[in-house]
Amino acid sequence: MLIAIGILGLIFLYVGVPWIYGQLARRLLERRAIEREALVLTFDDGPGSSLTPAILNILAESKAKATFFLLGRNIAGREAIVSQIAEQGHDICSHGYDHLHGWKVSPFRALSDIKRGWAAIDAALGTMRKKYPFRPPNGKLNIICLLYLLVRQVPIVYWSIDSGDTWRRRPDSLRVTQLAERAGGAVSLAHDFDRKNENTSRFVVESVRAALAMAADKGMRVLTVSELLDIGR
């Protein structure tokens, strides 16, 4: 009985505590966006060779800034796109290197993946920052990675609205627009990796256009994660 309780306690510590942290962080992020009447567009898993430039063009047309959580393995050969993201004033953050689920691999492999993702961004930009705001793949962290990020004071960034672009049954492309308008602010999640299905890429583009149009119409501020959270100030 005591062994079983001990095992359950370890499991709770390993994944339960980070899960609770994630839920609280998500709510605080949503509250901050609503308080500031802000729309924060974030994109995971890029850069894509075609979809990311398309998104950058839309953002440039609207003179809006967004946040890109880059996946290290997708950077090689697309360094010019990473530089373009930075040159246009968007936030560059990390989504790790291999999109590892923090609960399904060893803690040390997950931790190594975080560091490898940062290194890939630095290599593309020719910088030595060594750390960037981090979004856990699938929103999952283990206690080792959580403590490491907290000790190093690395912002851990979640989201409040999922665009649904990776769902098996995609919702209406107005999902982000409608939910963000109803809430009065949001941190949206979409994905800018290249798709085989052009309809999915079109869905992302339409979602971004609609959200930016709504923000302009309602006087909602379009901010980056750094601006929302006052990172680096």
Name each model feature, range by range:
Residues 2-18:
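N-terminal signal-anchor transmembrane alpha helix of single-pass membrane proteins
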Residues 17-103, 109, 116, 120, ...:
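Active-site beta->alpha N-cap acidic-glycine motif
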Residues 44, 59, 92, 134-137, ...:
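Divalent metal-coordination and catalytic microenvironments
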Residues 110-114, 170-176, 202-208:
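Charged helix-capping and loop-helix junction motifs
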Residues 110-125, 144-148, 175-180:
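Soluble catalytic domains of enzymes that build or remodel membrane lipids, polysaccharides, and related
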Residues 140, 146-181, 220-231:
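His/Asp/Glu-enriched short active-site or ligand-binding loop at hydrolase and phosphoryl-transfer sites
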Residues 180-229:
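Catalytic grooves of carbohydrate-active enzymes
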